[in-house]
Amino acid sequence: MRVFFYVQHLLGIGHLKRAAILAHALREAGFHVTLVSGGAPMPGIDVDVQLPPASAADLTFKTLLDDAGQLVDDAWKRRRAAALLDVWRASRADVLAVELFPFGRRQMRFELLPLLEDATRLAPRPLVVCSVRDVIQSRPEREAETVALARRYFDHVLVHGDPRLAAFDRSFGAAASLEGRLHYTGYVVANAVSPSDGAAEVLVSAGGGAVGVRLLESAMLAREHTLLRGATWRVLAGLNCSEADFRALQRHVKPGIALERSREDFAALLANCALSISQAGYNTVAETLQARVRAVLVPFAAGGESEQTLRAQLLAERGAAMMLDESALTVENLAEAVNRAARAPRPPADLVDLDGARRTAELIGEFWSAKNQPPAAPSARGPLYRGPKR
C-alpha cells in the first residue's frame, strides 16, 4: 500500500520530526511511504520529496518566505501548488496523509485545497487522513470552518495524544462534531533508549532553537543557584539558533556548562540526565515522558501561542513536571523550579500511551481494509428475510 505524507514546518522542526517518525513506523509495517516536506531541509531528517521550501517570517505565521528569505508571491504559490500536484499524481498513492490541516496551516490552503480536491475526484478515491498533535492553537472563531473542511475532505482524524492527559476538546471545542472520524493514537515518539551508567547531567534544550534563547541563557545563569550546581549542565541551542544568539550564549560558558548546537544522541542524553529544562513542544515532552525524567517546562507563549502552555499545565497538574510561565522566567524563578523538580519523584511509567507511531500505522491499515472490503453477499432468501415464521 502506498502512503503519500505531506508535512509543512514553518518555524521549528517538531512537525517534520514527528512526520519522519510516523513515516518510519509505516514503512516498518510494510507501507511504501512518500514523505513530502514543504519546509527547510533539516540535517538528520530524510524526506523523499523536498518542495521549494517555505518558512514563517515571524511568530504570527501569517507571512511566508521562500528559501532566499523573500516574501512569496502568487507566482511562487502557483509553482509550488503545481509541483505538489505533480508528485501526488505520480505517486498513485492509496492513502493521503496531511499533517495538521485543517486544524492549522491555513496559510497553505493555496496548495492543500487543490491537492484534496484532486484526491476527492479520483476513482477509486484514496483514503484521506489528517495527522494532528495532541493540542492545537485554539481558534474558536474558526472551528465551524475547520469541521466543515474535515467532513468534506477527510475520512479520519488521527490525534497523536492520549485523552487521559489531553482530550482534543481541551484545545478544539468542536471535537464532538467529528465523532466517528476522530481517533487517538497515543503519543508519537521514536523507540526508547535504555539508560546507561554515567554522570547524570542537567539537559537544557529549546527544540530547533528558532525561539528559546532567553530560556537557555537563564538556565546557564541559574545553575550556580540550584541543588544541581555540581552536575554538568549541557545546553543544546538548536540547529535554527542564529549565529548572533549562539555567540551571546557562549559568553556564559564556564566550567560545568557545555554548550552545543545539537546532538544526534539527544534521546540517550535525555534518558541519562538528572533533570531536563525545556520548552513544552510536543516532541520534547513525549521524549521526556518516555525517559521518565524530572523536568522543568517553560512553555513558548510569544505571539499569542497557547499550545505549549496548555500541555505544560496538564503535565504539571499530574505531577509529571514543574511549569514556569515564560512571562515569569527569571534566573531566580528558574532556579527555584529546578530545585522543586529535583526533589520531586520521577513521572509514572503509565501516565500516557507512548505507542502512537505503531498504532498510527495499525489504524491506517485497518481503515484501508475496511474501506476496500467487498460488500457482503446478499442473503439467498432476499434482503427482507427476517427468519422463519413461528
Predicted regions and their residues:
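Nucleotide-activated donor-dependent transferases that construct or modify glycoconjugates
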Residues: 1-12, 98-100
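A short, glycine/small-residue-rich beta-strand->loop->alpha-helix junction that serves as a flexible
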Residues: 7-20, 212-213
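Donor-nucleotide binding loops and adjacent catalytic segments primarily
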Residues: 23, 172-174, 187-275, 309, ...
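C-terminal amphipathic helix plus adjacent low-complexity
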Residues: 336, 340-390
